[in-house]
UniProtKB/Swiss-Prot annotation:
Catalytic activity: all-trans-zeaxanthin + 2 UDP-alpha-D-glucose = zeaxanthin bis(beta-D-glucoside) + 2 UDP + 2 H(+)
UniProt cross-references to Pfam families, sorted A to Z: UDPGT (PF00201)
Top enzyme class: transferase
Lineage per the UniProt record: Bacteria, Pseudomonadati, Pseudomonadota, Gammaproteobacteria, Enterobacterales
Protein name: Zeaxanthin glucosyltransferase
EC number, as in UniProt: 2.4.1.276
Organism field: Pantoea ananas
Gene: crtX
Amino acid sequence: MSHFAAIAPPFYSHVRALQNLAQELVARGHRVTFIQQYDIKHLIDSETIGFHSVGTDSHPPGALTRVLHLAAHPLGPSMLKLINEMARTTDMLCRELPQAFNDLAVDGVIVDQMEPAGALVAEALGLPFISVACALPLNREPDMPLAVMPFEYGTSDAARERYAASEKIYDWLMRRHDRVIAEHSHRMGLAPRQKLHQCFSPLAQISQLVPELDFPRKALPACFHAVGPLRETHAPSTSSSRYFTSSEKPRIFASLGTLQGHRYGLFKTIVKACEEIDGQLLLAHCGRLTDSQCEELARSRHTQVVDFADQSAALSQAQLAITHGGMNTVLDAINYRTPLLALPLAFDQPGVASRIVYHGIGKRASRFTTSHALARQMRSLLTNVDFQQRMAKIQTALRLAGGTMAAADIIEQVMCTGQPVLSGSGYATAL
């Protein structure tokens, strides 16, 4: 049995996806230890998974609060500050992980695509590592918009020029992080590199996004595996919570995720739009609103405001999901064929929203939209059965992709052979 280190950026959705994968590996007899700054310890709620804190000098307890605040407001100067914090974390991990891997006697490393330090250190120490895309894959292709870009997919010269120009702007913004990657690659004696997408595993790359939900890709590596959602494999069945009282009024679930749930003004717009169509609204703010804000929103008829909801239960009962475009929420909605109205706010959410529209499984709107315009889009989604019908193909693809168990099989195969695991190959699981 193997001992894996898990390296993720300090954000809930990324840690949660890797924790679900870690739990499956633990159930198979392996050990998994997350290694990061102290503050992400509270994000790991499984007693069977280890945690090893590093970087207390530069990232002391409480330091993550500032990073999460920047991530919740990632526009203008805050974006550059957030990128600088990402660079600081990668720098810290590149310095701390070699000793941690040796002290913990790590056999292999599971690395989120967004945190390259785990990949660099694993390669330098000769450890096998597996890259995981918990959000949109960051793999680049010449005629494909970057994951963070809001563009529709196109093959015209104008589209390709737009993609290329936006890539240059993105690379300029990320230059501080790029310098950290380049400096540590040189210090460790690795082949020159400076960008995230140059740090992915040559053995296996795992993605939650299936091709049926992506733009047409032509240049993914042979070791790239689209396994679908990384969910708990030994989780209890969906709760019996009933969130909607009427079967006659439209049932709408709205959530902006764990980082963006503070957007009271946007929630007010959603509430007004639901009033206009006389819909029932379940609004989950993930603990980000004040009591007075919750009370004000809940004054609206047929509106429930909660910190957290059982998302699977809510989406299985809802007829429409209003979301920021987070990968996990979108995949859950597809699983229940619940049409999507995306209000992308940051990170890869514009890219996810573009894919929702491209595949005809929902609509997108600006965060500055009016309640009347939002209501008009909601009516279209609720009355046009084509959205649900188009979801059926993607739903089937997600359920056949293999999920967490397939990802664990791939990881075990890497550890068993030390060779690249090619897409479509059988996965040996006995170690």
